[in-house]
């Protein structure tokens, strides 16, 4: 048996070798690094020590072990019905399809229901998403209709001559609801079966629900654990930043890029105390504990973990600026390793390298545990022990603990004892005090990117290191490195926007108004046509800039994955280099609220429009518009077109789930040729599945329209003061083929509009007329319109005008008025009488609107119109989004449930034909041209 000195020498050498592994580690190098880690344990083991290193990453260490692990993983995937997604991964678009299940709040009955139940509830930000309880005793009609119809089809086409015995065996082998599934196993199985973009969506929704996020995903089947860097790229958090001197302010940043001290909690051998419960208590302000980390006292929390041991989770504390809520003065990351550190040595080594302090929970410290920790002799991390020493090994614990004190450079203050009689609140305060002391001293601060760098050195796979992702990142950087000032970049590189586009849009509006005039002067019409052609020729004389050409190359990639990676990288890269500048000092953010009745100049918003992907697509649209206009006028032969393929590229992006701009937010005008060209290409790509229902939202700023749509359908509309769209964006949702006949459409086109001003009719002049036209256009295109309100008397005047204009045409979509309580989750919804008052605009406002639309004083209250009855679910009260105070607040369960009911009602109305006549894409094209 090797002496301790020799052991340490060997381990030190192994650690040095690992530290020299290149950041871009290859597969062979990764296997070498894993083998070195395994060799450390082989050198440490003595003949009298039965402990075996078992992280499942090295097949050579035990010929039987990987086989057992493989079968365990495969059994779990088979149990959950996910084995078919191991080659062709489950995609984000697959998970967002509208099906029979979208209309039913059904409970899972068999394990194969669990992944879909989790995804559906997570999409709706339901705090109960992690519950894997299955219901046995349910009525037959409580099962999803889609599954019933599938069973009926099987009965219809069943051949009695088929092998009955085989049918009996397959029936008897179906998993039963008695099979318990640990929620962490479900999460790991689903992540292993999902592509990178669905993994990213899962992480984003989990963050909104304040669930702990998977950081290292174990995969014993393929002998690689994966560090999930890409999966967390899209998570952005806002918190209160208070410098030592000066004024505090809110800061917004990606969790991947912002640096914070990290504290790891791990288990060694066995522990009577729950790490996850302790972490939840440490993270929760006041007496309300939020179950961020799933723990043993929750439903099914005691079920054995089959595949999730080795999972590393992460969560953060973010300060809010309120002394009564802020546990720590700065952001702090907390890491939790599932399983024993001896069985997951690579993960433990990673945690020791990235953490400022590691808390080790254990009941036993014997020779085996001593050897384990002795190998960390050179570590600079602080170590703390949380012991429960009442298992007959108290003396042994003390003996080895005393030997570890000089090895780990700790003292007796680093040893905490927690037994059943220990006061939990006092113990939590003590843990917080330790963390606070570490924060006040110089300590390591790391970002998730820094953690990924350390993971590569240890041989862990990083999800972001695939070739397609890195190629897309390189292309993004070639574009963004040239952006020093976003305003200057738009002026110099996106030349067709700005004044040329505004002038062309104004001329086209005037020309359109002449179309409706009784006797338009031909001379004026000819002059407008001449001016428009002149502007379009000026635009067509430009070539796309180098940045736009690089962007076009990125979205033209034949690889769908590379194209999607590129678009995501562009979103984050542009947000990083072109962060909007506040037009008011930071302290005003605390008191900012939308002014629904004032005369605020909407042309000068608090947040300037940030540079985004939509600006590059808008530039492509203007090249196409200018070229098409010249071809129509006979000024350019059709054979000389250079940009005819642009709408096809954009339609492919729409099919992948990217929101596309329908109405330009800066001019509030629609590039008709570009939009119709895009829809034509969409019709070609969808072939026979081109029946559409159009659902739009309109309303005042800051009422949560985009968040509502994102929660309801899993969409990606921009949210927040700094990035909310000012025009209108559209996104396509696919209806499952088995449900499209019943619903009456193949796709739902969802349109999210920017805010519409309210208040006096003449206060904003031409701007008001533009927004009234925008409301009329969106409501006129729609089968269903959701009108989002925040106060009981704030129906914008632009919407009143749109009602009056559409009533003349006879086109009345199905309207749903949504009143969102943005500030208080506990305020009850309006009573029926209040609902009717909600639809009665102020008398002077309604009379003025009627007079402007030449209807005299005959304007009726909205509640009196046939299409809007407050008693028939046309008016909805949505509780507040947050349960508690952000940034540590979770999404309210009441909000999630109310959104689900609204979604169910909308789909029922579409299904029952209450949403006016459904359209196909060609009809929508004609409607766009007409409106």
Curated annotation (Swiss-Prot):
Induction: By HBxAg. Up-regulated in gastric cancer tissues and also in gastric cancer cell lines (at protein level).
First-listed, main subcellular location of the protein, grouped into a coarse class: cytoplasm
Alphabetical keyword list: Cell cycle, Cytoplasm, GTP-binding, Nucleotide-binding, Nucleus, Phosphoprotein
Pfam families in UniProt: URGCP (PF25496)
Keyword Ribonucleoprotein: no
Residue ranges of every copy of the VLIG-type G domain listed in the record: 689-929
Residue numbers carrying Phosphoserine: 3
Membrane-spanning residues: none
GO cellular component labels: cytosol; nucleus
Top-level taxon of the source organism: Eukaryota
Location(s), subcellular: Cytoplasm; Nucleus
Record-linked InterPro entries: G_VLIG_dom (IPR030383), GTP-bd (IPR006073), P-loop_NTPase (IPR027417)
Gene Ontology terms for molecular function: GTP binding
Coiled coil start-end: none
Tissue and organ expression note: Strongly expressed in hepatitis B virus-infected liver and in HCC cells. Also highly expressed in well-differentiated gastric cancer tissues and various gastric cancer cell lines.
Family affiliation: Belongs to the TRAFAC class dynamin-like GTPase superfamily. Very large inducible GTPase (VLIG) family.
PANTHER family the record matches: UP-REGULATOR OF CELL PROLIFERATION, URG4-RELATED
Function text: May be involved in cell cycle progression through the regulation of cyclin D1 expression. May participate in the development of hepatocellular carcinoma (HCC) by promoting hepatocellular growth and survival. May play an important role in development of gastric cancer.
Protein's name according to its UniProt entry: Up-regulator of cell proliferation
Organism: Homo sapiens
Underlying gene: URGCP
């Amino acid at each position: 048996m090797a002496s301790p000195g020799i052991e340490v020498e060997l381990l030190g050498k192994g650690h040095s070798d690992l530290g020299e592994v290149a950041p871009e580690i290859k597969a062979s190098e990764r296997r070498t690094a894993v083998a070195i880690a395994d060799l450390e344990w082989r050198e440490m083991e003595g003949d009298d020590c039965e402990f075996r290193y078992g992280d499942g990453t090295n097949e050579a260490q035990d010929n039987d072990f990987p086989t057992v692990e493989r079968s365990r993983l495969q059994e779990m995937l088979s149990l959950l019905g996910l084995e078919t997604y191991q080659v062709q991964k489950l995609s984000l678009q697959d998970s967002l399809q509208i099906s029979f299940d979208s209309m039913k709040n059904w409970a899972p009955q068999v394990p194969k229901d669990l992944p879909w139940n989790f995804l559906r509830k997570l999409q709706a930000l339901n705090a109960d998403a992690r519950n894997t309880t299955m219901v046995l005793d349910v009525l037959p009609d409580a099962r999803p209709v889609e599954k019933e119809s599938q069973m009926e089809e099987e009965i219809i086409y069943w051949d009695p001559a088929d092998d009955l015995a085989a049918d009996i065996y397959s029936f008897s082998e179906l998993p039963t609801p008695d099979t318990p599934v640990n929620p962490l196993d479900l999460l790991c199985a689903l992540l292993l079966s999902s592509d990178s973009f669905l993994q990213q969506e899962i992480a984003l929704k989990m963050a909104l629900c304040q669930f702990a996020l998977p950081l290292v995903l174990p995969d014993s089947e393929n002998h690689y654990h994966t560090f999930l860097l890409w999966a967390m790229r899209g998570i952005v958090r806002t918190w209160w930043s208070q410098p030592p001197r000066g004024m505090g302010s809110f800061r917004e940043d990606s969790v991947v890029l912002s640096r914070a001290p990290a504290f790891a909690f791990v288990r060694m051998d066995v522990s009577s105390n729950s790490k996850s419960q302790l972490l939840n208590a440490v993270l929760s302000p006041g007496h309300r504990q939020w179950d961020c980390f799933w723990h043993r006292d929750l439903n099914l929390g005691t079920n054995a973990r089959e595949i999730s041991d080795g999972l590393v989770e992460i969560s953060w504390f973010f300060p809010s600026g309120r002394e009564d809520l802020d546990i720590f003065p700065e952001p702090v990351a907390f890491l939790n390793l599932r399983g024993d550190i001896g069985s997951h040595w690579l993960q433990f080594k990673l945690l020791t390298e990235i953490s400022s302090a590691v808390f080790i929970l254990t009941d036993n410290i014997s020779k085996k545990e001593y050897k384990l920790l002795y190998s960390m002799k050179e570590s600079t991390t602080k170590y703390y022990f949380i012991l429960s020493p009442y298992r007959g090994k108290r003396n042994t614990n003390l003996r080895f603990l005393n030997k570890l004190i000089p090895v780990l450079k700790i003292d007796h203050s680093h040893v905490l004892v927690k037994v059943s009689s220990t006061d939990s609140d006092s113990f939590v305060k003590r843990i917080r005090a330790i963390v606070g002391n570490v924060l006040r001293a110089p300590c390591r601060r790391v970002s998730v990117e820094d953690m990924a760098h350390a993971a590569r050195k240890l041989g862990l796979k990083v999800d972001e290191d695939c070739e397609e992702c890195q190629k897309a990142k390189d292309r993004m950087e070639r574009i963004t490195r040239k952006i020093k000032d976003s305003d200057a970049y738009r002026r110099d590189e996106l030349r067709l926007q700005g004044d040329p586009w505004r002038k062309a849009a104004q001329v086209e509006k005037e020309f359109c108004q002449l179309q409706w005039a009784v006797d338009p002067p031909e001379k004026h019409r000819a002059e407008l046509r001449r001016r428009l052609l002149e502007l379009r020729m000026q635009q067509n004389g430009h070539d796309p800039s180098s940045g736009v050409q690089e962007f076009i190359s990125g979205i033209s990639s034949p690889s769908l994955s590379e194209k999607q990676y590129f678009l995501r990288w562009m979103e984050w890269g542009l947000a990083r280099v072109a962060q909007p500048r506040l037009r008011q000092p930071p302290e005003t953010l605390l008191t900012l609220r939308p002014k629904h009745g004032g005369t605020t100049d909407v042309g000068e918003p608090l947040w300037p429009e940030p540079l985004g992907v939509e600006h590059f697509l808008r530039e492509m649209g203007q090249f196409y518009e200018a070229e098409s206009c010249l071809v129509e006028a006979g000024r350019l032969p059709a054979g000389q077109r250079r940009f005819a393929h642009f709408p096809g590229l954009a339609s492919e992006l729409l099919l992948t789930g990217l929101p596309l701009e329908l109405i330009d937010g800066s001019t509030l005008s629609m590039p008709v040729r570009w939009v119709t060209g895009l829809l034509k290409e969409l019709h070609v790509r969808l072939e026979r599945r081109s029946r559409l229902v159009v659902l739009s939202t309109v309303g005042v700023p800051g009422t949560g329209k985009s968040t509502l749509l994102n929660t309801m359908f899993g969409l990606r509309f921009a949210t927040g003061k700094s990035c909310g769209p000012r025009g209108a964006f559209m996104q396509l949702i696919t209806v499952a083929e088995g449900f499209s006949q019943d619903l009456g459409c193949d796709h739902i086109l969802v349109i999210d509009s920017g805010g519409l001003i309210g208040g006096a009719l003449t206060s904003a002049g031409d701007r008001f007329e533009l927004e009234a036209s925008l409301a009329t256009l969106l409501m006129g295109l729609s089968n269903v319109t959701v009108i989002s309100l925040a106060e009981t008397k704030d129906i914008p005047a632009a919407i009143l005008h749109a009602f009056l204009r559409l009533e003349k045409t006879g086109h009345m979509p199905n309207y749903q008025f949504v009143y969102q309580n943005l500030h208080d989750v506990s305020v009850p919804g309006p009573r029926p009488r209040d609902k009717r008052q909600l639809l009665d605009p102020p008398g002077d406002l309604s009379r003025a609107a009627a007079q402007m639309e030449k209807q005299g004083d005959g304007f009726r209250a909205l509640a009196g119109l046939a299409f809007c009855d407050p008693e028939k679910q046309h008016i909805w009260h949505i509780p507040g989004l947050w349960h508690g105070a952000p940034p540590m607040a979770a999404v309210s369960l009441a909000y999630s449930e109310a959104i689900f009911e609204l979604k169910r009602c909308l789909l029922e109305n579409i299904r029952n034909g209450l949403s006016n006549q459904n359209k196909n894409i060609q009809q929508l094209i004609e409607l766009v041209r007409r409106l």
